[in-house]
Amino acid sequence: MIKIGVIIGTTRPTRKGPLVANWLMEKINKLDIKNTEFVLLDIQKEDLPFLMDPKSPADGDYELASTKKWSKKIDELDGFIFITAEYNNGPAAPLKNAIDTIYREWDRKPVAFVGYGTYGATRAVEQLVDITAKIGMAPLSKTFVGISKFWDAVDEDGNIKEEYVNGNVEKLVDNLLWWAKALKDKK
């Protein structure tokens, strides 16, 4: 069984990450994938204070209960989809904090990206590709899905209009699962 974490990377009260996550999960559920579980993680609901654990995350010797809880959740997963907005040409600080709070739990795991914003969060994703590669993850930018002109991309009922979606969710998931299986088998 492959377990994929779908992480909503924003925490603002007016954020649209949950809307994008629901859209993504609906698309994934239609794919009818066997032997795979997709786990939705919303960092707004996680207790992740900004780098408050007194020791370096590289050691994995966490003191805070919140860090231990986050570590366990991430450690149990085989790959990730980061859902990110773009704030001032980069990813939201809470997502970066969620990455930086722990370390070894991300190692040798693939990560795909779904971005939303004026330009589909391309600049935020570019930075996340670099960040995740530096901590030993396998970033999969080739199958990135971006939702551009986001304020126009959502209709009055809160649905995402497909004409604003760049990329293909099925290809993203297929690529992510290939890497998750390959890397899990090598651990």
Question: In which residue ranges do the predicted regions lie?
Answer:
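N-terminal beta1-alpha1-beta2 submodule of the flavodoxin-like/Rossmannoid cofactor-binding fold
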Residues: 1-84, 90-97, 101, 156-187
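Short, histidine-centered active-site or binding-site loop motifs used for metal coordination
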Residues: 8-10, 115, 151
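Short, proline-centered helix/strand-breaking motifs
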Residues: 84-85, 110
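Glycine-rich nucleotide phosphate-binding loop and flanking beta-alpha elements
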Residues: 88-89, 120
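Short, glycine-/small-residue-rich phosphate/pyrophosphate-handling segment
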Residues: 107-149, 163-167
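Internal, active-site/partner-interface "lid" segment
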Residues: 149-157
